[in-house]
């Protein structure tokens, strides 16, 4: 999946664009739309086009990282996690999306990543809130997933259970929704 314009706009709005190097709140040398790395040098200046190119390259790296989470994501949830990874890094993305955590738990946990240098940062708090809201707005309901289960899109038995858990769903809740649909159809 690729980041939509909604996700790109979110990242650009919170990162801002600076064409000269600066130190971010975590102390890293930064340029453009929050680009960091060994290629960023003190006193460096870039053009707007270079800032856009850095952003595009960085997005690809974070999109791959979000894809590796193996979560069953809608575009909105994907965009939220790319923004999160862009700002917090791949290591924190892995911690956030650890195996067994449901998508609702992930949405709640996003809010806790609002510190830099051990201090709560208002801008990070606002960003995490927007990312959490965007993420939640994309989570499929248990009923939607149950309909996919009934269409055999998730496999059978233990395979289905493991796939649902790996994708960030509560197996018990989805199974209850499946049973409710089956009971309703039996009336």
Give residue ranges: language-model regions.
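Extracytoplasmic Gram-positive cell-surface binding/anchoring modules and repeats
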Residues: 142, 151-161, 171
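Active-site nucleophile-His-acid catalytic modules used for acyl/amide transfer and hydrolysis
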Residues: 60-91
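Repeat-associated, polar segments at repeat-unit boundaries in modular proteins
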Residues: 128, 132-139, 167-187
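Short alpha-helical scaffolding segments that buttress acidic/His motifs in well-ordered protein cores
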Residues: 11, 78-85, 109-110, 149
């Amino acid at each position: 999946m690729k980041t939509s314009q909604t996700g790109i706009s979110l990242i650009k709005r919170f990162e801002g664009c600076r064409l000269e190097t600066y130190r971010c709140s975590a102390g890293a040398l930064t340029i453009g739309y929050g680009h960091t790395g060994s290629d960023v040098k003190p006193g460096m200046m870039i053009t707007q086009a270079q800032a856009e190119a850095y952003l595009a390259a960085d997005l690809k790296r974070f999109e791959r990282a979000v894809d590796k989470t193996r979560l069953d994501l809608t575009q909105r949830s994907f965009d939220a996690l790319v923004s999160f990874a862009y700002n917090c890094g791949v290591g924190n993305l892995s911690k956030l999306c650890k195996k067994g955590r449901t998508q609702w738990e992930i949405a709640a946990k996003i809010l806790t990543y609002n510190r830099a240098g051990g201090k709560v940062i208002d801008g990070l708090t606002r960003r995490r809130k927007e990312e959490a809201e965007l993420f939640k707005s994309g989570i499929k309901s248990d009923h939607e997933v149950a309909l996919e289960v009934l269409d055999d899109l998730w496999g059978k038995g233990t395979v289905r259970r493991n796939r649902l858990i790996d994708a960030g769903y509560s197996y018990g809740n989805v199974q209850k929704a499946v049973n409710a649909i089956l009971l309703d159809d039996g009336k």
